[in-house]
Each structure stands twice: as C-alpha cells, then as structure tokens.
Swiss-Prot record:
Entry superkingdom: Bacteria
Similarity comment: family membership: Belongs to the glutamyl-tRNA reductase family.
Function: Catalyzes the NADPH-dependent reduction of glutamyl-tRNA(Glu) to glutamate 1-semialdehyde (GSA).
CDD domains, A to Z: NAD_bind_Glutamyl_tRNA_reduct
Note: During catalysis, the active site Cys acts as a nucleophile attacking the alpha-carbonyl group of tRNA-bound glutamate with the formation of a thioester intermediate between enzyme and glutamate, and the concomitant release of tRNA(Glu). The thioester intermediate is finally reduced by direct hydride transfer from NADPH, to form the product GSA.
Species: Escherichia fergusonii (strain ATCC 35469 / DSM 13698 / CCUG 18766 / IAM 14443 / JCM 21226 / LMG 7866 / NBRC 102419 / NCTC 12128 / CDC 0568-73)
SUPFAM superfamilies (UniProt xref): Glutamyl tRNA-reductase catalytic, N-terminal domain, Glutamyl tRNA-reductase dimerization domain, NAD(P)-binding Rossmann-fold domains
UniProtKB keywords: NADP, Oxidoreductase, Porphyrin biosynthesis
Disulfide pairings: none
Single GO biological process annotation from the record: protoporphyrinogen IX biosynthetic process from glutamate
Descriptive protein name: Glutamyl-tRNA reductase
C-alpha cells in the first residue's frame, strides 16, 4: 500500500488551467466513483478549491502507476497530458503525509496561515466518506492532519495577525473599538473584499451593518447572508451620521465620501469619533477627511504596512509550524510502518495457530482410539516443531547457498539466536 498526493495549485498552474482541472461539487460523487474504479486505487479524497485541485490516494504499487493516474485525470477533464504534466506535482508516502499536513495548516496557501483551507480539507474528507473511503491508512492520515493543523494554530502565531486587506480592516476596527457589538458599520460597495469584510464583522457580532452599493441586487444578496440593511449610494450623505465605522471599496473613479459629508455627519453625532477605512484604488474618501477632528481615516497603504508587518510575523511562526509538521509526519510514518508489521504478525500467528490446531486434532483423535499417550505426545511435539521451523530453515539454507551473510544475520536476529 502506498499513499499518494498529486495535483496542481496556485504556485504551479495559472487559473486558466486550474479551472479546467477543478471538480464541481455536483459531480464530485461521480468523480470519486470513477477514480475508485481504477484497479490500483483503494481509497481516495478529492480536494478542489479555487487555488488547488489535489487527489489524495491509497494505492497498490504497480508499474506505470503515475502514468495511469495522470491519464485518468486527463481523460476525466478532457485535457492534453502535456499541458497538465508541466504543472503537476506528485508526492509519495512521507512526502504525501507532510504535504497534506502543510495544506491543512495553511502553510501551502496563497495567504500564508489562512484558516479557511482547514474547513475545505475537512469537507473534502467528509465527502469522500459517503461510500468512497475504503482505506483506513488514508482516513488516519486525514484525521492526523486535522489534529496537526489544530496544534499549529494553538502552538504558533500563524493565524494571529491579519494578512489580507479585508481582515486587516476588521482587525483595525476591533483594535479601535473595544467591542463591535455596540457599533454600526457602513460598508460601501459589494465586491469580493467587502464580502469578506462583512463576513468577518458578522463573526464578531457587529450590532448593525448597512451596505451602500450602486446596484441594489448585488448588495441584497450579501445583505441577506450577513443580516444587513441595503441603501443606495445617494443615501450615504443622509445615513452617514449613524455609522461608527465606514469601510469602503468600490470601483468609482471619483471619491464617494467627501469632507463636507463627513463634517455634517460629525456635527449630527456631536463629534463622536468615526473610523473610515478606505481600501479602494482610486480612493473612495477624500484625503482631506483625515484632517477633521474625530475622523480617523486609514487608506489601503496604511493597511498594507500593517499587513507587511504581520506577514513577517506569520513567516516566523511558519518556521515553528514546519517543525511541528516534520515531527508529526515522522510519528505518522512510524505508525504506518508498525501497521504493516502488525499485518505480517497477524498472518504469521494465524499460520502457526492453524498448524497447532491441525496437529492437536490428529493427536486427540489418536488418543480417543486408545493409542499410547506418551508416544502420541512425543509425536505431536516432534511434528509441531518440524512444521514451525520448516519455513525459517529453508530461508536460512537459501541465504547460506547465496552467500548472503547480511540476510543470514537478519534471520538469526529474527529467530532470537545469539
């Protein structure tokens, strides 16, 4: 039995290839069935995200194994083999175990240490268990990777600092406001970055969210997900006074929030402070707003300096995490080798018990027929000894004939001979 990990990711393949190799959720069961129909595959898990598609497999070793699996992947997705080969990586046994642990821990992610990948790995594993998981070693490898990822998060600071613009914006808000459960947040825009911001804020139980966007339909989809109110961009001037925090990210070529607008809002708020985080390029908030008393304006450049500092901290934590992964990989491989030995021990014991039962039955039958008890017992002992030492004796003789002293010494050691 061999453990394999093969696939492509953001480091080895462009998005144009990654999207062609991805497995859609509605066809995943079909893909797993097709994969497990391959004669060499004992068990499989398919991990498919926007940044990676990977197969984790338990296989029987055979000639041209790599060729067969690449051919299956290309046939399934109707790909040219040469296009895939240039981007494909292949890990076996120790390297496959280490790779999965690194992936689950966020060490192989586009954003170092990002936590979402662990949930994606867990879902891929759960999907594989719907009648597809047939290899206990593969199952154990995934369970181990989950505990390793948890250990990495607990024992290092890999996830402690914000390294995305969206997360950095939310982190800044949490640093300035003691609790988000008492604040109102105005989000301007409804693109991917604002979506991430909204989800982070929901996780931290913000009191109220308002989403202002050019098109109401797009904003409404996000609002329904996070429990927010939707307003038009033209309503911002009137509603700005309600917001303790404003986070803006649109594609507008001109500022949406001007100095006069913020001045009016501050006056209505009786100069209660406002945090404005402008993560748009070009800027959504006029720079002059930052000169107003009680208006604290941060631009995307301010966030990038926070991110750069935090990324350096994550890289330092990643060194500690890699040490944990190396240790846990070694322990898992020791367990795996022990499992192989356990199967051999079970077979050897079963064989010995079969010989014992066969000869004992013959001896008991002879006793029932009135045979001499002492002679029967001596015959049993002699036959049992000969049957048990027959195979080791043949191996010793063959090693001697071959002049294989190393094998002779291994056999002597295995038989407990001085």
């Amino acid at each position: 039995m061999t453990l394999l990990a093969l696939g492509i990711n953001h480091k080895t393949a462009p998005v144009s290839l990654r999207e062609r190799v991805s497995f859609s959720p509605d066809k995943l069961d079909q893909a797993l069935d097709s994969l497990l129909a391959q004669p060499m595959v004992q068990g499989g898990v398919v991990l498919s995200t926007c940044n990676r598609t990977e197969l984790y497999l338990s296989v029987e070793e055979q000639d041209n194994l790599q060729e067969a699996l690449i051919r299956w992947l290309c046939d399934y997705h109707n790909l040219n083999e040469e296009d895939l080969r240039k981007s494909l990586y292949w890990h076996q046994d120790n390297d496959a175990v280490s790779h999965l642990m690194r992936v689950a821990s966020g060490l192989d992610s586009l954003v170092l240490g990002e936590p979402q990948i662990l949930g994606q790995v867990k879902k891929a594993f759960a999907d594989s268990q719907k009648g597809h998981m047939k290899a206990s070693e593969l199952e154990r490898m995934f369970q181990k990777s989950f505990s390793v990822a948890k250990r990495v998060r607990t024992e290092t600071d890999i996830g402690a600092s914000a390294v995305s613009v969206a997360f950095a914006a939310c982190t800044l808000a949490r640093q300035i406001f003691e609790s988000l459960s008492t604040v109102t947040v105005l989000l301007v825009g409804a693109g991917e970055t604002i979506e991430l911001v909204a989800r982070h804020l929901r996780e931290h139980k913000v009191q109220k969210m308002i989403i202002a966007n050019r098109t109401r339909e797009r904003a409404q989809i996000l609002a329904d997900e996070v429990g927010a109110e939707v307003i038009a961009l033209s309503d911002i001037d009137e509603r700005l006074r309600e917001a303790d925090i404003i986070i803006s990210s649109t594609a507008s070529p001109l500022p949406i929030i001007g100095k006069g607008m913020v001045e009016r809002a501050l006056k209505s708020r009786r100069n209660q402070p406002m945090l404005l985080v402008d993560i748009a390029v070009p800027r959504d908030v006029e720079p002059e707003v930052g000169k107003l008393a009680n208006a604290y304006l941060y631009s995307v450049d301010d966030l990038q300096s926070i991110i750069s500092h935090n990324l350096a901290q994550r890289k330092a934590a990643a060194v500690e995490a890699e040490t944990i992964v190396a240790q846990e990989t070694s322990e898992f491989m020791s367990w795996l080798r022990a499992q192989s030995a356990s199967e051999t021990i079970r077979e050897y014991r079963s064989q010995a018990e079969h010989i014992r039962d066969e000869l004992t039955a013959k001896a008991l039958a002879a006793l029932e027929q009135g045979g001499d008890a002492q002679a029967i017992m001596q015959d049993l002992a002699w036959k049992l000894t000969n049957r048990l030492i027959h195979a080791p004796t043949k191996s010793l003789q063959q090693a001697a004939r071959d002049g294989d002293n190393e094998r002779l010494n291994i056999l002597r050691d295995s038989l407990g001979l001085e």
